[in-house]
Amino acid sequence: MALPIDPMEEPRMYQQTLLQDGLYDLLESDMMVDCVLKIKDKEFPCHRLVLAACSSYFRAFFKSGVEESKQREIVLEDVEPGVMGIILKYLYTSNINVTEQNVQDIFALSNMLQIPSIFTVCVSFLQKRLSLSNCLAIFRLGLMLDCPRLAISARNFACERFQFITRDEEFLQLTPSELAAVLASDSLNVETEQDVFEALIKWVGHDQENRIGDLPDLLDCIRLRLVPRDYFVKNVEKHEWLSSNPEITKKLQLVKDAHAGKLPELKKTKNKKSPSEEGQKKGDEEEVEEEEEQEERLPGILNDNLRFGMFLRELIFLINDSASVAYDPTGNDCYVASVSTQIPKNHCSLVTKENQIFVAGGLFFDEQSKDEQIYSYFLQFDPASSDWMGMPPIPSPRFLFGMGEAENFIFVIGGREMKEGENILNTVMVYDRQFLKWAESDPLPYLVYGHGVVSHNEMIYVIGGKGENKECLNRVCAYDIKTHQWKDLAPLNTARSLFGVTIHKNNIYVVAGVTDSGLTGSAEVYDIKTNKWSEFVEFPQDRSSLSLVSVSGVLYAVGGFAMFPKEDSDDLMPLEMNDIWRYDESERTWSGILRENRYASGATVLGVRLNTLRLTKM
C-alpha cells in the first residue's frame, strides 16, 4: 500500500513535475535552446538556465563574464560524450541509469560539474554494492573525490573484513596515508594486534625500497601495548627493519617502559580562550582572557584502546526457527544474535574452524528449476548484519544427517531422504566455500542416520547412528580428505544414536542418546592419538538429542528429550528439556547452571565466537 502524500508537499510535487516535463518538452522541440555543449564529435543542445540551476560549475562559468561563457557553443575537454548525455538526461527527466560499468565516470563528472543530486545517487549506488573485491577501490575513490560519506563507508566495510582484504592485491597498492586510515581505525575486526602488525610488515615488504621510510610513522598506528610481551620481543623488537632504525627503537623503548608500568609524563599546555559574556564587564574595563589547561596526548604507539574485533567472546549459540540466541555461561548473560525466522525445523548446524556458521536442512522448493525442484536449505550467518544469508541449496534433501568440515569444504553425510520411503543414505555431498558449489564426494561405506559427525585436524569422524536394519551402530569411521578414503576406527563401547558429541581438548566426547533398549545417560571419550574409547562420567538423566559443546575449555550439555510418566498413567512420554549443564573436571560431576532457556527448544547448539558489541542483551 502506497504511503499517503503530505498535503503540504502535494502542490510542490505537481509543480516540480510540471516544470521538469515542460523543460524536457522544450528540449525535445528544440525551443528556446540557447546553448550547445560540444564534447569531442558530439553536440548536446540545452538551456543555460537548466545548467546553471543544477550545476554550481556552470553557474559560476556563466556568471564569470569571460568570452567563452557568452558563446553559444561551449567546448568541454576530457569528458566522455556518453557520460555527459546520461547526466543531461537526468537534469531534464530525473531518470538516470547508473551501472557498475559507468558509475565511476558519472561520479567523477558529477563531482567536477558540482551536481550534488547525481553525486548522492552514485554514492548510494556504490555503498549498496560494497564487496570484498571492490571496497578498497571505492575507499580510494571516495578519498580522491573528497567524499567522506563514501570513504568512511568503504573503510568501515574493509575494517569489518580486515583478515580478508589483507590477502588482496589492492591492499598492497594502498598509499601510506590510505593505509594509515585503515590501520588506525578502532573498528578493525581483529582478535589480536599481531594481525595488524603483520599486515603492516606485509605492505612494506611488497615494495621495501620505497616504503621502508614510511615505517616509523605507520608504526604509530599499531597498538603495541596490546601485543603479548613475548611476541613483542621476538617479532617486533628483533625485526631487522625496526631494530636498525634509531627513530623506531626510541618508540619501541616507550612501549617497553609502558610494559614496565612507566608512561611518559604529559605536560599541560595553556590555551587562551576568547572572553565570554560573563567575563566582560560594564564600562571601559579591560577584557579578561581566560586560560584553559590542556593535557598532551600519549604517542600513538602507546594507544591501548581495544579494537572492535577484540570484544569477541566464546558463547553457546542456540539456533531454532524463531531466533538465534547466544548465551554466555560465565556471566549468565543472554544475547539476541538474529530474529530471522527462515531457519528450518529439524536442521543441522556447523561452525568451522574460521568461526563461519552454517545451517542446513528443511525443504526448499525451486519453481524455476526444470531438472530438480526440491532442495534443502543451506544458510550462512552474517554477524555484520545479524542475519542468515541464503547459499546454494543442497541438491539432495535429507534429514537426520551430519555435517563436518575439512580444508575449504563442508560435508553433508548420510541421513534419510526427505521423500516418500525415506530411504537411508550413505551419500556425501560436499560444498566448496571458495567457488560456492555443491558436488558429490566419496560415499560412506555403510548406510546411516541419526549419527554424530565431528571434525578435527582436517579429518571427519562419523560416529554411531542407526543402520539399514534400524538398529543402533557402534561403528566409527574417519574420512581423510588428502587420501579421499574412509577408514574404520575403534568402535563405541555402547551402540547409540541421537547423542551429544563434540571435540573437547583434542578428544571426542559422546554423551547420552538412544540405544536399542531405550534412552541412556552413559558417556564415553575417544582418544584420537591412541584410537581408544574409555568410559566417561555419566550424564545425570537418560536423554536423546542432547547437544554437547566445548566453550572456553569447558564442556556443556544442552537440552534434549527425557521420558516422563503421563498423568494418571504408567506410560512414558518424551518431554523436551531446555536446560544447560556444565561438567566440572576437578569434581568429575555434571551440574545444572540454567534451568530453562526457551530458545533451546528445537535448537541446534554450537560453541562459537561472537562480538558482544553487535548483540542485543536480553
Curated annotation (Swiss-Prot):
Compartments (UniProt record): Cytoplasm; Cytoplasm, Myofibril, Sarcomere, A band; Cytoplasm, Myofibril, Sarcomere, I band
The residues forming the signal peptide are: none
Q: Describe the function of this protein.
A: Substrate-specific adapter of a BCR (BTB-CUL3-RBX1) E3 ubiquitin ligase complex. Required for skeletal muscle development.
Under the heading InterPro entries, the entry gives:
BACK (IPR011705), BTB-kelch_protein (IPR017096), BTB/POZ_dom (IPR000210), Kelch-typ_b-propeller (IPR015915), Kelch_1 (IPR006652), KLHL40_BTB/POZ_dom (IPR030607), SKP1/BTB/POZ_sf (IPR011333)
Which Gene3D superfamilies has this protein been placed in? 1.25.40.420, Kelch-type beta propeller, Potassium Channel Kv1.1, Chain A
The protein in question is named Kelch-like protein 40b
Q: CDD domains from the xrefs?
A: BACK_KLHL40_KBTBD5, BTB_POZ_KLHL40_KBTBD5
Q: How does it assemble?
A: Component of the BCR(KLHL40) E3 ubiquitin ligase complex.
Residue ranges constituting the BACK domain according to the UniProt record:
135-237
Compositional bias annotation for Basic and acidic residues: 264-284
Regions of compositional bias (Acidic residues) in chain numbering: 285-295
